[in-house]
């Protein structure tokens, strides 16, 4: 049924207002809407004053929806972007879900300029020269129709000893918020100090990580850092480059060590494994972990 389909529309215009308005990229049936898609636009663009991707009627039909931009290619080449600076949702109030990638006259604009471009660190731009192509624009995105990603999440400390004794889901009441406000996403109260007390972990660890359920589905670019680690009250030194963002989709993990995970392949920040065990992560009375969630989406190096 054509009436049930969601039309995906592109607006892209340069500083002279020339470009394409409501260019139909594809019409998607409801049963095919959720998931990852690649949209292709064939044309030219010298720079972008307006750059939006619209899903006609989707915000009205699926009010609990979210669209994440995974990749943008210009003439076949991927470009960098900071999706934390995009705007998402029914921005115009007409039931249309919009991802506003750049708009000098749109949400968040000041004086017909974008205060901080998602495509560079240039401030107060009226147009974005990074968006230019001679033949083709490709946008890879993921559509989620059963959740916006906003809400309260719980970071759980997980540690497992060599005998598979475990603390699985200890959080001491910790929680943080993914806030959706003014059509943007942000992290609220995202710095933590969790202390776990036990006498069962002196032999070391085969797994130690912080885990957040369900969030990876929405924000696979979520980034956190381990700020400090204390074992039995003493601060431990470590190689911060080896404490890694990882996933057990739809769960996110800040992985200190996992004999089945990413750190098994890339090396442990705390020492050399003895088989599967990192003895340096052992403790006789307490483990205290201080960590911070920084961004929901990956931040490029400009």
Residue ranges and their predicted role:
Residues 1-4, 37-45, 70-73, 78-79, ...:
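Extra-cytoplasmic beta-strand recognition segments
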Residues 2-3, 17, 58-66, 145-149, ...:
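Extended, low-complexity, turn-rich repeat/linker tracts enriched in Gly/Pro/Ser/Thr and Asp/Glu
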Residues 13, 17-44, 83-112, 166-199, ...:
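Extracellular carbohydrate recognition and processing domains
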Residues 39-65, 114-124, 134-136, 191-221, ...:
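Extracellular beta-strand ligand-recognition surfaces/modules
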Residues 62-83, 149-151, 221-236, 299-302:
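Exposed low-complexity, polar/acidic, P/S/T/G-rich flexible segments that act as propeptides
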Residues 91-93, 113-147, 248-251, 256, ...:
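A charged, solvent-exposed segment within the mature domains of Sec-exported extracytoplasmic proteins
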């Amino acid at each position: 049924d054509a009436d049930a389909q969601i039309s995906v529309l592109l607006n892209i215009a340069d500083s002279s207002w020339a470009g394409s308005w409501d260019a139909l990229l594809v019409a998607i049936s409801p049963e095919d809407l959720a998931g990852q898609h690649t949209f292709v636009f064939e044309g030219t663009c010298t720079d972008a004053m307006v750059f939006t991707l619209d899903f006609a009627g989707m915000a009205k039909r699926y009010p609990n929806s979210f669209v994440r931009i995974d990749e943008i290619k210009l003439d076949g080449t991927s470009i960098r972007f900071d999706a934390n600076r995009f705007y998402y949702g029914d921005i115009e109030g007409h039931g249309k879900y919009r991802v506003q990638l750049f708009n000098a006259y749109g949400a968040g604009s000041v004086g017909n300029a974008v205060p901080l471009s998602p495509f560079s660190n240039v401030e107060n731009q009226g147009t974005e020269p990074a968006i230019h192509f001679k033949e083709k624009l490709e946008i890879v995105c993921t559509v989620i129709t059963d959740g916006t990603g906003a809400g309260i999440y719980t970071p759980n400390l997980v540690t497992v000893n060599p005998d598979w004794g475990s603390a699985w889901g200890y959080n001491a009441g910790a929680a943080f918020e993914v806030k959706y406000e003014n059509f943007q996403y942000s992290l609220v109260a995202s710095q933590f100090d969790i202390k776990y007390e036990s006498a069962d972990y002196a032999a070391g660890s085969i797994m130690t990580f912080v885990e957040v359920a369900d969030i990876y589905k929405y924000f696979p670019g979520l980034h956190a850092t381990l700020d400090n680690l204390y074992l039995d009250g003493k601060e431990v030194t470590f190689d911060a480059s080896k404490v890694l963002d990882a996933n057990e989709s739809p769960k996110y993990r800040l992985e200190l060590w996992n004999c089945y995970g990413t750190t098994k392949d890339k090396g442990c920040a705390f020492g050399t494994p003895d088989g599967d065990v990192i003895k340096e992560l052992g403790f006789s009375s307490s483990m205290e972990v201080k960590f911070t969630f920084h961004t929901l989406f990956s931040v490029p190096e400009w």
